[in-house]
Regions:
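The substrate-binding groove and active-site-proximal loops of carbohydrate-active enzymes
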Residues: 30-35, 71-85, 123-133, 156-165, ...
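Aromatic-lined carbohydrate-recognition surfaces of secreted/lumenal glycan-active proteins
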Residues: 104-108, 154-163, 171-195, 244-252, ...
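Catalytic-core region of carbohydrate-active enzymes that cleave or remodel glycosidic bonds
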Residues: 184, 225-294
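Aromatic-rich peripheral "rim/lid" segments of glycoside hydrolase catalytic domains that contact
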Residues: 264-267, 279-281, 288, 292-336
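Boundary/entry segment of secreted carbohydrate-active catalytic domains
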Residues: 24-50
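Substrate-binding cleft and catalytic face of glycoside hydrolase catalytic domains
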Residues: 54-70, 85-163, 257-259, 301-306
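Bacterial N-terminal signal peptides
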Residues: 6-18
Length: 336
């Protein structure tokens, strides 16, 4: 669908979106919990709620070796407490007791550091193993999510090549997940995949992992970062209108580094640490998106439920805990 520049600007400004009042009333202000190794209590949920978050995202991981393409997960043992049914169920109960909502987001890791977005098996045997085992993995957690009252289920994370190569499989998988979960669905598209994901019509939200490169320089100002966001925001507004779905940032985050806006997906432990650069990047994000009616909300990548803030603050990774970025999140989530 062709949109004129004038209409695109109107969409970016939030004009004429039919779900505006509904989206404004239900903004998702969430955090992605890094699955805790050991059992955690209500204080972990309370800490997140203290910054104004109203959702958490739980991520039970699976693992695959490219040699055989089989997706492996171990819900009966062998994974972290926060990835197993007992841990997931406990965290859902604690969140619900505090009036919060939960997204369940199965997340696949590949061996040798390979990116899931470009991986496809290299044989018919590999494809069969990949498809069958991924379906078992996703359906297991869809059924679990339904049973424990999860509010939103994510069917996949950054799997562009798989989706593009096997659209019939994914349509059938969505049918099965819909039957098992019986609730709203999304898919977490990588930032460079979101415009071409073919199945948004079957999702309730356009999900995007929002690691868009927005400024190549070190320590940019908030104003410079806002300029870097403009084209991406226009494209997301256009997509939202065409697909008639709100946009949810299923992951959104910046490392605590001077160049965090240049390659936001990249984590470099040797990069210069800069809390203020991380905080400015977050502030620019909210300045651009928070008042757009097609913006459904975001999940902050990421939050360590089992670490004290002082420990989580160390290094230069994504966590906002104990850093200047946490103050930005608190201000924006609480509307202060």
């Amino acid at each position: 669908m062709y949109l004129t520049t004038r209409l695109a600007i109107a969409l970016f400004m939030g004009v004429g979106i039919c779900w505006s009042s509904r989206a404004e009333a239900q903004k998702i202000e969430g955090v992605c919990f890094s699955a805790p190794r050991n059992e955690v209590g209500d204080s972990s949920i309370a800490q997140v709620q203290s910054i104004g978050a109203n959702w958490i995202c739980l991520m039970p991981y699976a693992f695959a070796r490219t040699e055989d393409a089989k997706v492996r997960f171990h819900p009966d043992g062998g994974q972290y407490w926060g990835e197993m049914p007992a841990g997931i169920s406990a965290m859902v109960r604690m969140a619900k007791a505090r009036g919060m909502k939960v997204m369940l987001k199965p997340h696949l890791w590949l061996g040798h550091g390979e990116f899931t977005g470009t991986y496809v098996p290299d044989s018919a045997i590999g494809w069969k193993a990949y498809e069958q085992s991924y379906q078992e993995y996703v359906l297991y957690y869809a059924k679990l999510g339904h049973g424990i009252g999860v509010d939103l289920f994510c069917i996949g994370t950054e799997m562009q090549a798989f989706v593009q190569a096997r659209p019939i499989y994914w349509n059938k998988l969505i049918d099965k997940v819909s039957d098992a979960f019986q609730g709203p669905l999304t898919y977490a598209a990588n930032w460079d995949e979101v415009a071409n994901f073919p199945l948004w019509d079957r999702m309730n939200y356009i999900g995007v992992d929002g690691y868009f490169p927005i400024c190549a320089k070190d320590r940019p100002t908030v104003a410079e970062l806002e300029v870097g966001w403009q084209q991406h925001a226009l494209e997301l507004a256009r997509l939202s209108t065409v697909k008639e779905r709100p946009v949810l940032f299923t992951e959104m985050g910046y490392c605590c580094t001077a160049d965090c806006a240049a390659r936001p997906w990249s984590e470099d432990p040797e990069a210069p640490r800069d809390e203020n650069a991380q905080a400015r990047a977050w502030q620019a994000f909210f300045n651009v998106y928070a008042d757009k009616p097609w913006y459904a909300g975001c999940f902050v990548w990421k939050w360590f439920a089992d670490l004290p803030q002082d420990e989580a603050r160390r290094g230069n990774g994504f966590s906002p805990q104990g850093r200047a970025a946490m103050n930005v999140l608190r201000k924006e989530f609480k509307g202060q």
